[in-house]
């Protein structure tokens, strides 16, 4: 099974064409401001409820699966459990990594919920999927944003970059806002924040903006991505009662309280 095979004139192509058009530096910052510390959008919801909401969500940017996102969540977690049976936190990370896609309940379009992420505020690298469509982005010809570093300084660190907005950043903000209500450590919060940052962790772009220590984050993300991406090859996967019960108990352990979203 060939994964991440992006062809033109497909639903994925038209999705990215729209995402690349609207996600300018200015617009992305307006969304980050809206959702920073969850802004005014604060609802009470358990992690179980958020996972259940993925039962009816299919990622329109993904050419590799037409399954609901909840199936992919359990697939990823189970593949991790087979290789790391004692690493409970990594299993939980596999299960929850896409739960930021609940953004759709706030009326956000798919172009602000799913898809690969990339840096705004500097030159767009050709490692971005459907790179040619980046020419529709107003920042493409903006002299302030079209140099290698743009508004950033060399080696400023990936945590100081502004990435296109979507479910990664939103779930990261949820976890940050709810510190003390869960047991997810910084290592796995970073994996969640950067797991869709394919131009960086797979395309090896933006290395001039990395600071010492960022290579550790990259290694962690790449390791996680092996489970996130390749779990989709298991087309016969079935969520059994045992699987559901195992992860229910695991989520209760790592998320003992209701979260603000």
Per-segment meaning from a language model:
Residues 21, 40-43, 47, 214, ...:
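Intrinsic-disorder-associated interaction segments
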Residues 35-71, 150-158:
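Active-site flanking loop/helix segments enriched in acidic
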Residues 65-241:
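Divalent metal-dependent catalytic cores for phosphoryl transfer on phosphate-bearing substrates
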């Amino acid at each position: 099974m060939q994964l991440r095979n992006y062809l033109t004139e497909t639903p994925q192509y038209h999705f990215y064409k729209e995402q690349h058009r609207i996600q300018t530096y200015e617009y992305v910052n307006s969304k980050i401001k809206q959702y920073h510390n969850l802004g005014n959008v604060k609802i009470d919801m358990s992690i179980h409820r958020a996972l259940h909401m993925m039962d009816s969500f299919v990622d329109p940017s993904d050419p590799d699966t037409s399954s609901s996102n909840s199936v992919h969540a359990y697939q990823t977690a189970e593949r991790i459990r087979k290789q790391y049976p004692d690493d409970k936190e990594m299993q939980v990370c596999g299960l929850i990594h896409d739960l930021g896609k609940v953004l759709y309940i706030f009326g956000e379009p798919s172009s602000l919920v799913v898809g690969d992420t990339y840096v705004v505020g500097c030159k767009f690298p050709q490692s971005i999927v459907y790179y040619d469509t980046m020419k529709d982005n107003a920042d493409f010809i903006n002299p302030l944003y079209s140099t290698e570093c743009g508004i950033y300084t060399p080696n400023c660190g990936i945590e100081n970059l502004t990435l296109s907005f979507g479910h990664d950043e939103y779930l990261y903000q949820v976890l940050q806002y709810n510190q003390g209500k869960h047991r997810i450590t910084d290592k796995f919060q970073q994996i969640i924040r950067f797991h869709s940052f394919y131009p960086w962790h797979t395309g090896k772009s933006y290395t001039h903006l990395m600071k010492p220590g960022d290579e550790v984050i990259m290694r962690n993300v790449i390791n996680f991505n092996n489970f996130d991406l390749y779990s989709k090859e298991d087309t016969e996967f079935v969520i059994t009662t045992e699987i559901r019960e195992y992860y229910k108990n695991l989520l209760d352990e790592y998320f003992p309280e209701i979260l603000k979203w």
